[in-house]
Amino acid sequence: MFDIGVNLTSSQFSRDHDEVVARARAAGVHGMLLTGTNLPESQQAQRMASHYSGCWSTAGVHPHDGSSWSPAVAEAIYTLAREPQVVAIGECGLDFNRNFSTPQEQEAAFSAQLALAAELAMPVFLHCRDAHDRFLALLKPWLEKIPGAVLHCFTGSRSEVQECLDLGLFIGITGWVCDERRGLELRELLPAIPAERLLLETDAPYLLPRDLKPRPASRRNEPAYLPHILASVASWRGEETQWLEAQTDANVRTLFGIDVNGV
């Protein structure tokens, strides 16, 4: 079982990294992709990935931090991305929900990271919120030049997921799908995602599955809860949990080049 989205650099994990990783392993999560969202956190994620076996990382700048993009940051991300633990560029994309960075800053950072991924022949770890059309417009010209892409934490519509699938994207599903208030539409479109394009993630410490029992007192999500998401998704798709686990592990190997069975 592989969690493609763990924010282990979050301050919520600052006191118990070792315990979080140990609990994940005990739960059967044998691999994790640690997300980089700006230069310092990308550097920290790479250090953590080199410290913990079965962990890899991304290197990039989240749209919220698009204003931080500069030639110096680009050079540092380029250098970091060549470390063996780094297997994707990102988290990059567009987020027009709150615009912590202006749309123009976000678009510049996103386009630059797509160019970087093409130059390095690396897949991209993508973020899109309230920006679907513009996101795809910027992404499309690069898709033939990069080896693959996953739209992480997908929460969009049926038409949006179909557009992404038509472009060859992998789709990342989180515990959002376990939310009986906000996740029902996503739950209904799960069968529309081909098994060979599906990836699973917790996005920990965020998006604790609402139907998890018992719920942790901290309300903090952890990669140890990925088996709950896996079992839920398999049930709603009408598939055996063990089969879907093997398929999503194979998808990780396909997209990121990670030897999942060697972990």
UniProtKB/Swiss-Prot annotation:
Enzyme class: hydrolase
Enzyme Commission code(s) on record: 3.1.11.-, 3.1.13.-
Gene3D superfamilies found in the cross-reference section: Metal-dependent hydrolases
GO cellular component, one term: cytosol
PROSITE patterns associated with the record: TATD_2, TATD_3
Principal location listed in the UniProt entry: cytoplasm
SUPFAM superfamilies according to UniProt: Metallo-dependent hydrolases
GO molecular function terms listed in the Swiss-Prot or TrEMBL record: 3'-5'-RNA exonuclease activity; magnesium ion binding; single-stranded DNA 3'-5' DNA exonuclease activity
Subcellular location field: Cytoplasm
One Pfam match: TatD_DNase
Positions bound to a divalent metal cation: E91, H127, H152
Co-factor(s): Mg(2+)
Keywords: Cytoplasm, Exonuclease, Hydrolase, Magnesium, Metal-binding, Nuclease
Protein function: 3'-5' exonuclease that prefers single-stranded DNA and RNA. May play a role in the H(2)O(2)-induced DNA damage repair.
HAMAP family to which the protein is assigned, alphabetical: TatD_exonuclease (MF_00901)
Quaternary state and interactors: Monomer.
Family statement drawn from the similarity comment of this UniProt entry: Belongs to the metallo-dependent hydrolases superfamily. TatD-type hydrolase family. TatD subfamily.
Name listed for the protein in its UniProt record: 3'-5' ssDNA/RNA exonuclease TatD
Organism, as annotated: Klebsiella pneumoniae (strain 342)
